[in-house]
Amino acid sequence: MGQKINPLGFRLGGENQKHRSLWFAQPKSYSIGLQEDEKIRDCIKNYVQKNMRISSGFEGIAHIEIKKKIDLIQVIIYIGFPNLLIEGRTRGIEELQINVQKGFHSVNRRLNIAITRVAKPYGQPNILAEYIALQLKNRVSFRKAMKKAIELTEQADTKGIQVQIAGRIDGKEIARVEWIREGRVPLQTIRAKIDHCSYTVRTIYGVLGIKIWIFVDEQ
């Protein structure tokens, strides 16, 4: 049976995939910095869920990039629908910044948060996974949800997409894996830019796992 490596880690360090946490640390304090990054991301996601303008099942965050210096922590939030979070709120980013600072203790370091809009949100696997999760929570057929997600990626001019759902689908007693593919998804080609995400959704039947691979371009 073939072993599935994470396509992001497989391409990390090359031209197609960059690190989303940019900082250096001594080996003894590396784990502390890693936990700090996780707290920052969790605080941001919790704040977005509580303050956005639509259902709490859809955050619209593509990914979060963290850059650290000696006296500065810079956080860039790549979001597909920024109006859902900051529309009509002049101090939205300031409130988010204060909220994140409360979540972790930073000594002698400033925190700077910026929001960047993603040009084609439905070309981001995290946003698509959240969309599918929201549909599954609303008891929409999993096949219909997957096909609709593939239709949305056509707006982003992607070259291929693969969607996989695993678990007790439709409440069946035996867990199974269902997947659908449209276009090319060359996972073994290193020069191919592949976006990937794994997402967990809790339904009334149990936990379902969603995985999405998107073939963006080839160098």
From Swiss-Prot:
<dbReference type="InterPro" id="IPR036419">
    <property type="entry name" value="Ribosomal_S3_C_sf"/>
</dbReference>
<dbReference type="InterPro" id="IPR004044">
    <property type="entry name" value="KH_dom_type_2"/>
</dbReference>
<keyword id="KW-0150">Chloroplast</keyword>
<dbReference type="InterPro" id="IPR005704">
    <property type="entry name" value="Ribosomal_uS3_bac-typ"/>
</dbReference>
<keyword id="KW-0699">rRNA-binding</keyword>
<dbReference type="InterPro" id="IPR015946">
    <property type="entry name" value="KH_dom-like_a/b"/>
</dbReference>
<dbReference type="GO" id="GO:0003735">
    <property type="term" value="F:structural constituent of ribosome"/>
</dbReference>
<dbReference type="GO" id="GO:0006412">
    <property type="term" value="P:translation"/>
</dbReference>
<dbReference type="GO" id="GO:0019843">
    <property type="term" value="F:rRNA binding"/>
</dbReference>
<keyword id="KW-0694">RNA-binding</keyword>
<dbReference type="InterPro" id="IPR009019">
    <property type="entry name" value="KH_sf_prok-type"/>
</dbReference>
<keyword id="KW-0689">Ribosomal protein</keyword>
<dbReference type="InterPro" id="IPR001351">
    <property type="entry name" value="Ribosomal_uS3_C"/>
</dbReference>
<feature type="domain" description="KH type-2">
    <location>
        <begin position="44"/>
        <end position="119"/>
    </location>
</feature>
<dbReference type="InterPro" id="IPR018280">
    <property type="entry name" value="Ribosomal_uS3_CS"/>
</dbReference>
<dbReference type="GO" id="GO:0009507">
    <property type="term" value="C:chloroplast"/>
</dbReference>
<keyword id="KW-0934">Plastid</keyword>
<dbReference type="GO" id="GO:0022627">
    <property type="term" value="C:cytosolic small ribosomal subunit"/>
</dbReference>
<comment type="subunit">
    <text>Part of the 30S ribosomal subunit.</text>
</comment>
<dbReference type="Pfam" id="PF00189">
    <property type="entry name" value="Ribosomal_S3_C"/>
</dbReference>
<keyword id="KW-0687">Ribonucleoprotein</keyword>
<comment type="similarity">
    <text>Belongs to the universal ribosomal protein uS3 family.</text>
</comment>
<protein>
    <recommendedName>
        <fullName>Small ribosomal subunit protein uS3c</fullName>
    </recommendedName>
</protein>
